[in-house]
Amino acid sequence: MCGIVGLYLKNKKYNKDLGKFLTGMMNNMSTRGPDSAGFAIYSTERKKKYKYSICYNENNIKEIKKNLSKEIKDAKIKIISDHFVLETSLKPVKVISIIKSYDNLNLVGYGSSIEIFKQVGNPRDVVNNFSLKNFSGTHAIGHTRMATESAITTDGSHPYSTGEDECLVHNGSLSNHNNLRRTLKKKGIEI
């Protein structure tokens, strides 16, 4: 049992309230998935800029930030709870390679408009930890999870990044996950 919410705003005057709207929706779904939660926020596309949503598993974020800023000269880093968003004009192939060189960093999504955040814990706590109510954007998707067949981890939390400016949430187990995994790997998608 999980909860899925989504919101697409057709009127730009509400973009500043997207996080507030999604917070209420996530809170209402808390009982359907009390183990962990996550959300993806889409904002207006920033031409020639990419945003990388990264979860870090170490307390020394200042050192990580300093090192990344040396490797990615135009990096702007915004820390939010145990995640940060790195913005740069460098192409994804280069930045993803740099991020993967750090054992304590986990890339959870990237693109010119998407930011993804997820954590273990009650969804009410998760949305508060990330101050979701303060986010603005054009559309969003959220997920509350009740782990039934796998461990309760941030990696197991949704949304899952499926590519540049793409994400996926699902409700229930995928009985053909091994076939899907093999098919995706054959197409060059890293899992």
Predicted features, each with a name:
Residues 1-191:
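Conserved short alpha-helical segments that host acidic/polar catalytic motifs at enzyme active sites
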